[in-house]
């Protein structure tokens, strides 16, 4: 990457920003922590982390004007990566709460069903199975990598084509990642998933950098000669 991309890490009082920031910086990004919509719009890419409850996350995003800002940025083509709860809030609704989600992806967040011997929350390492091998997050990754999960709820996309990866907990297959154009999100924590997770973060950083470079080239091409 010729230019260091600026990645905005959304600070809205929900999420482990320290680990995500360290992981992104290790992969070549300049990271800005911000809860300001204008700062997010100036970045080359945005990472939306999150841990905790669905309604709390939605409330804090909306109270800060970040919900509408994120929707507008995604629709404008800005690369966006959701992590854990940051994936779930992208959907229409959740069994956990009563507030509507951001609605960027159609579908609902569901709770794992109880079954004998199954631990909920799902905590620990699990294997990824790619459903969409063309998702930019999987570049230079082999299928079957192991990543780290901490969650009781999972997303159930209304469109099968939005599912980028899946995993299995007990007898239940669930969506582990989604990908649609510039919008990507994962249920697991890439910043805690060793080399596989760091490669995923690097792929997102490079995706943001390539979009930024393309925009610079387009501006130069349309600039009138001196």
UniProtKB/Swiss-Prot annotation:
Primary subcellular site in the record, as a coarse category: cytoplasm
Active site: 84 (nucleophile), 189, 191
Record bears the keyword Lyase: yes
Gene3D superfamilies: 3.40.50.880
Listed GO biological process terms: L-histidine biosynthetic process
Gene Ontology CC terms, in alphabetical order: cytoplasm
Keyword list, A-Z: Amino-acid biosynthesis, Cytoplasm, Glutamine amidotransferase, Histidine biosynthesis, Hydrolase, Lyase
Keyword Lyase applies: yes
UniProt EC number: 4.3.2.10, 3.5.1.2
Reaction catalyzed: 5-[(5-phospho-1-deoxy-D-ribulos-1-ylimino)methylamino]-1-(5-phospho-beta-D-ribosyl)imidazole-4-carboxamide + L-glutamine = D-erythro-1-(imidazol-4-yl)glycerol 3-phosphate + 5-amino-1-(5-phospho-beta-D-ribosyl)imidazole-4-carboxamide + L-glutamate + H(+); L-glutamine + H2O = L-glutamate + NH4(+)
Pathway(s): Amino-acid biosynthesis; L-histidine biosynthesis; L-histidine from 5-phospho-alpha-D-ribose 1-diphosphate: step 5/9
Highest taxon above the source species: Bacteria
Subcellular location: Cytoplasm
Occurrences of domain Glutamine amidotransferase type-1 (ranges): 6-214
GO molecular function: glutaminase activity; imidazoleglycerol-phosphate synthase activity; lyase activity
Subunit: Heterodimer of HisH and HisF.
Task of the protein: IGPS catalyzes the conversion of PRFAR and glutamine to IGP, AICAR and glutamate. The HisH subunit catalyzes the hydrolysis of glutamine to glutamate and ammonia as part of the synthesis of IGP and AICAR. The resulting ammonia molecule is channeled to the active site of HisF.
NCBIfam families reported in the protein's UniProt record: IMP_synth_hisH
HAMAP family assigned to the protein according to its UniProt record, in alphabetical order: HisH
The protein, known as: Imidazole glycerol phosphate synthase subunit HisH
Protein source organism: Gloeobacter violaceus (strain ATCC 29082 / PCC 7421)
